[in-house]
């Protein structure tokens, strides 16, 4: 009896597999982009690997700059060229302006009440307007200049105390961005509080986790077995408790500060925008700022220093520019950096090779659309592979894999959403609204880093320190911390 049951089961599996591949073969005749072969149930999930941006780039060389994957039951377009990115983010920007639902972001970001992951619609338009006009305007960016300068001065003092010894560059830059963003968004630093630091680490780690249930709903129990559901619930609750305390402290305060929480509470009290924001909305917006402002800026500065130490001639050129413009001054001001063209080229080149989110936050189509020669149904997800676009030889030339800031000196290409060959912050309606906010910190911090100190790699670990191995996760960092030796020039 048991042997007969096994024969029936095996026959059934073979029959289902044959039907699946016949259906897939027929599907190839439909007017959709090319797809890699997929497996039953999981589709192309097995082809993502530990570094999906690299795996998808390799697949695009075979299946084209616009290819269709099936991640479980979810159809996903993968974009790997500037031309296709332009079609998605400009020509059909409104159609692809929404975000897909995700268990991770629902649990951690107040069920899409934030700016980054809210679905496209009136609510998203209103809160984006609040962020752009009231929190991230040029006036607000300038108003926090003293905060940036104070924290950079403290960082310089830490380096001075470690002069001629190995400096953990990664740790320094991480602390700097965390302290600056905390003061601007929350009104004070939290870097000395172990619980809040561990909470943010847990959040960053979970954002890079894979939820099986999001793509294969009937296998959602795997998220429970693996502990992901429990981690999401605990971290989401802990985040809410932390942010609730922060907001309540501001409510109980004098209201005279100008950090982001106070600005949002003032908007709530005055009802001055024709749109009511509630407590959850305030916490969601603040969480966006903490996550995006801290992790992305830190990653970019860390990669910039890595590339400069890997290419000493570029480091010398940058130091010569900074020291010439700031001759006689101990520090670099934000006015000084306006004239530093090579500094800006270094940062552009870093974003090209090391976009902090190599796969931009996913988009989703809100209606059927014709994209080139293809019919794309409503509800199709889109992954923009910024990492692949930044290394596209057709755009950047045969040395596209090489760090060469000079390529930007006579180029008008920028990362502010008008040039689709460089999209580390996205483009179109969903472009990161905090570009200016992030870039000014990166520029002035990096300029001060190289102005007062000469940097070199430890002789006993040069190979390890110049390694560009990547971490896993949504934001890509160095796999190992960067150490270097600083020697003062004064």
From Swiss-Prot:
<dbReference type="GO" id="GO:0020037">
    <property type="term" value="F:heme binding"/>
</dbReference>
<dbReference type="InterPro" id="IPR001128">
    <property type="entry name" value="Cyt_P450"/>
</dbReference>
<comment type="similarity">
    <text>Belongs to the cytochrome P450 family.</text>
</comment>
<protein>
    <recommendedName>
        <fullName>Cytochrome P450 71A21</fullName>
        <ecNumber>1.14.-.-</ecNumber>
    </recommendedName>
</protein>
<keyword id="KW-0503">Monooxygenase</keyword>
<dbReference type="Pfam" id="PF00067">
    <property type="entry name" value="p450"/>
</dbReference>
<dbReference type="InterPro" id="IPR017972">
    <property type="entry name" value="Cyt_P450_CS"/>
</dbReference>
<dbReference type="GO" id="GO:0004497">
    <property type="term" value="F:monooxygenase activity"/>
</dbReference>
<feature type="binding site" description="axial binding residue">
    <location>
        <position position="432"/>
    </location>
    <ligand>
        <name>heme</name>
    </ligand>
</feature>
<dbReference type="GO" id="GO:0016705">
    <property type="term" value="F:oxidoreductase activity, acting on paired donors, with incorporation or reduction of molecular oxygen"/>
</dbReference>
<keyword id="KW-0479">Metal-binding</keyword>
<dbReference type="InterPro" id="IPR002401">
    <property type="entry name" value="Cyt_P450_E_grp-I"/>
</dbReference>
<keyword id="KW-0812">Transmembrane</keyword>
<keyword id="KW-0349">Heme</keyword>
<dbReference type="GO" id="GO:0016020">
    <property type="term" value="C:membrane"/>
</dbReference>
<keyword id="KW-0408">Iron</keyword>
<dbReference type="GO" id="GO:0005506">
    <property type="term" value="F:iron ion binding"/>
</dbReference>
<keyword id="KW-0472">Membrane</keyword>
<keyword id="KW-0560">Oxidoreductase</keyword>
<keyword id="KW-1133">Transmembrane helix</keyword>
<dbReference type="InterPro" id="IPR036396">
    <property type="entry name" value="Cyt_P450_sf"/>
</dbReference>
<feature type="transmembrane region" description="Helical">
    <location>
        <begin position="1"/>
        <end position="21"/>
    </location>
</feature>
């Amino acid at each position: 009896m048991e042997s007969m049951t096994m024969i029936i089961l095996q026959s059934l599996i073979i029959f289902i597999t044959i039907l699946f591949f016949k259906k897939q073969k027929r599907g190839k005749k439909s007017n959709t982009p090319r797809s890699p072969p997929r497996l039953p149930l999981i589709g192309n999930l097995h082809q993502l690997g530990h570094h999906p941006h690299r795996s998808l780039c390799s697949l695009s060389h075979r299946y084209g700059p616009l290819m269709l994957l099936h991640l479980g039951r979810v159809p996903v377009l993968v974009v790997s060229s500037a031309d296709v990115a332009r079609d998605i983010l400009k020509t059909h920007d409104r159609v692809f302006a929404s975000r897909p639902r995700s268990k991770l972001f629902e649990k951690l970001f107040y069920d899409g009440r934030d700016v980054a992951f809210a679905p496209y619609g009136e609510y998203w338009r209103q809160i984006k307007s609040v962020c752009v006009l009231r929190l991230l305007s040029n006036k607000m960016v300038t108003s926090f200049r003293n905060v940036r300068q104070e924290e950079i001065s403290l960082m310089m003092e830490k380096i001075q105390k470690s002069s001629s010894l190995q400096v953990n560059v990664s740790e320094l830059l991480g602390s700097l961005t965390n302290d600056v963003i905390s003061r601007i968004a929350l009104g004070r630093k939290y870097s000395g509080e172990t619980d809040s630091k561990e909470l943010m680490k847990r959040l960053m780690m979970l954002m890079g986790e894979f939820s099986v249930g999001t793509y294969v709903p009937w296998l959602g129990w795997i998220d429970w077995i693996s502990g992901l559901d429990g981690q999401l619930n605990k971290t989401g609750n802990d985040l809410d408790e932390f942010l609730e305390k922060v907001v309540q402290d501001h409510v109980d305060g004098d209201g005279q500060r100008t950090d982001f929480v106070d600005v949002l509470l003032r908007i709530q009290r005055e009802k001055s925008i024709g749109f009511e924001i509630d407590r959850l909305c305030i916490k969601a917006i603040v969480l966006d700022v903490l996550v995006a402002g801290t992790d992305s800026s830190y990653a970019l500065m860390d990669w910039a220093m890595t590339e400069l130490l890997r290419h000493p001639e570029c480091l010398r050129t940058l130091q010569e520019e900074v020291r010439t413009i700031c001759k006689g001054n101990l520090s670099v001001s934000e006015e000084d950096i306006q004239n530093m063209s090579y500094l800006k080229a270094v940062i552009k080149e870093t974003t090209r090779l090391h976009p902090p989110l190599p796969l931009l936050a996913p988009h989703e189509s809100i209606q059927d659309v014709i994209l080139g020669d293809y019919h794309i149904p409503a509800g199709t997800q889109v992954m923009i592979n910024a990492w692949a676009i930044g290394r596209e030889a057709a755009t950047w030339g045969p040395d596209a894999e090489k760090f060469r800031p000079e390529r930007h000196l006579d180029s008008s290409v920028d990362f502010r959403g008008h040039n689709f060959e460089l999209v580390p912050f996205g483009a179109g309606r969903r472009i990161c609204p905090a570009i200016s906010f992030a870039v000014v910190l990166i520029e002035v911090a990096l300029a001060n880093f190289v102005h007062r100190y000469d940097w070199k790699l430890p002789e006993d670990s040069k190979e390890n320190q110049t390694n560009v191995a990547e971490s896993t996760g949504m934001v890509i960092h160095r796999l190992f911390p960067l150490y270097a030796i600083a020697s003062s020039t004064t």
